Amino acid sequence: MTNDKIRNFAIIAHIDHGKSTLADRILEFTSTVSARESKAQILDSMELEQERGITIKLNAVQIKYKDYIFHLIDTPGHVDFTYEVSRSLAACEGALLLVDATQGIQAQTLANVYLAMEHDLEIIPIINKIDLPSADPERVKAEIENIIGIDASNAILISAKTGANIDKVIEAIIEKVPCPKEADSTKPLEALIFDSYFDNYRGVVILTRIFNGEVKVGDEIYFMQTKKSYFVTELGVKNPNEVKKDKLSAGEVGWISASIRDVKDVSVGDTLTLANNKLTTPLPGYKKLKPVVYTGFYPVDTRDYNDLKDALEKISLSDSSIVWEPETSKALGFGFRIGFLGLLHMDVLQERLEREFNLDIIATAPSVEFVVTLTNGDVQYITNPSLFPDRSTIKSIEEPFIKASIFLSDEYLGAIMELCQQKRGKYIDIEYIDDHRRKLIYELPLNEIIFDFFDLMKSYSKGYASFEYDFIGLRESDLVKVDILLNGEKIDALAMIVHRDFAYNKSRDLTEKLKEVIPRQNFEIPVQAAIGAKIIARETIKSYRKDVTAKLYGGDVTRRQKLLKKQKLGKKRMKSIGTVEVPQEAFLAILKTDTSKKRE
């Protein structure tokens, strides 16, 4: 197979614009998948992806069409999984830009297009869902030209659902996507690891793009970053199931198994070469993203701690963006503090741990990384609110800020601007895309975004607004630590860092929520929120009352008083030794506290 017959491309789009459906149609049109094997979301192999209707993991598949070989790398569309997209694009020469004919350009479309431009990819604009009555392809073409700045006059109009014009997409891939540059099978092996996963029988399986050279079964491969070497036991391509081959050559995308048992030996973004003919300089990898949200994961059964550690190591293989370290909590025991790229990322990882590894997890409320400068000049990076230093020792607190670009219709402008103001946002600019659509730019503290901003934005705009963001650095803020006390004892896992102006409202909301979700006991439980020694909110969980006087009838009143006094003493003793069981809902309650509500 000569290089001029190979095409490597990805599909980029905003979530729900029909990316996985288009991938399905391409696989069917090229007979890679027969009609009998076909199903919705063929490349979304994870059960979670099928259920939620989203792509979480990238996937690489080889397609044979006439005398050409295509390598389609499917990418996620949600803002949390941008790192998956950047990995996919590093292995491609072209990208199909898919835009919904009814919704037009959305925030994540733009973010992914800019990533593709950074990688100098050939971009082919495709307008999907033209079969819908509300489709407006001409408006979308104008948007692509005005916002992105690429010629959309020849944009391909398709319906991935019905399969209309899929043949034109295939022809455009052949004509417009460049063949792999300077791929030479005679040079030393030069391959980029863009993904990996763990197989219980074979160990670590690597997904790789071969830029130069070739690799065969039995070759000794060398990882340039981890400096480890292994012998290849199996290799091949996906179409979309694994197909074994004898070798992978320059320009190809495939998988390699080398009986690697230690997950730390493989690093996504590393360069693969041969042990007996090494490269001197590694390939430029993609940029490693810094976690945005930090949360504590604790096993419900403390005996599962080592199982949770093993599960995190295996998931880290294919999800190189998560960072984690052990931590302990008085309330929850031993667990891990984990860094994620966003709340959906956190939600998906928790669900994967519970499904794939049969673990029961308690997740604490998410937090961002605060930079605290102490009066003695020391600087601390705090991701766990319970470790916040004493206020008297703090000179200044800085929190991360973002620049948010929100795409929305005119009718929702007022509501979304009000939401941004409530979240301590600073208005920067508004851009007019066309007669009805606007791009709103705000600077916002990340700590306000990670809780409920996305849900509220969708709610206020009936699902039509979308946003993406970039970090703009740290800024000093007047932040305080709010401790939650149950029965007079601090629950470290419920502590939160909030702006002083919102501390009272958030504390009132949280104590009310905790009162609802914590089960009643045989004694009264005060639920308090405190800043330092000052209590700023309180609710009381009423006790169960056993009617100890029910057996009395008539007789002396002192008998009744004696029984009630005895009950009171029993409850007092129980209160002093009783521990309050805190359910998972209590930790989720922090996510649901809504400072956008107006309090009278």
Curated annotation (Swiss-Prot):
GO terms for biological process: positive regulation of translation. The keyword Phosphoprotein does not apply. Its EC number is 3.6.5.n1. The keyword Protein biosynthesis applies. It catalyses: GTP + H2O = GDP + phosphate + H(+). Its main location: membrane. It comes from the Bacteria. One of its GO terms (molecular function) is translation elongation factor activity. Residues 4-181 form the tr-type G domain. It is a peripheral membrane protein. GO terms for cellular component: plasma membrane. GTP binds at residues 16-21, 128-131. SUPFAM superfamilies: EF-G C-terminal domain-like, P-loop containing nucleoside triphosphate hydrolases, Translation proteins. It is an enzyme of class 3 (hydrolase). It is found in: Cell membrane. Keywords: Cell membrane, GTP-binding, Hydrolase, Membrane, Nucleotide-binding, Protein biosynthesis. Belongs to the TRAFAC class translation factor GTPase superfamily. Classic translation factor GTPase family. LepA subfamily. Required for accurate and efficient protein synthesis under certain stress conditions. May act as a fidelity factor of the translation reaction, by catalyzing a one-codon backward translocation of tRNAs on improperly translocated ribosomes. Back-translocation proceeds from a post-translocation (POST) complex to a pre-translocation (PRE) complex, thus giving elongation factor G a second chance to translocate the tRNAs correctly. Binds to ribosomes in a GTP-dependent manner. NCBIfam families: lepA, small_GTP. This is Elongation factor 4. It comes from Metamycoplasma arthritidis (strain 158L3-1) (Mycoplasma arthritidis).
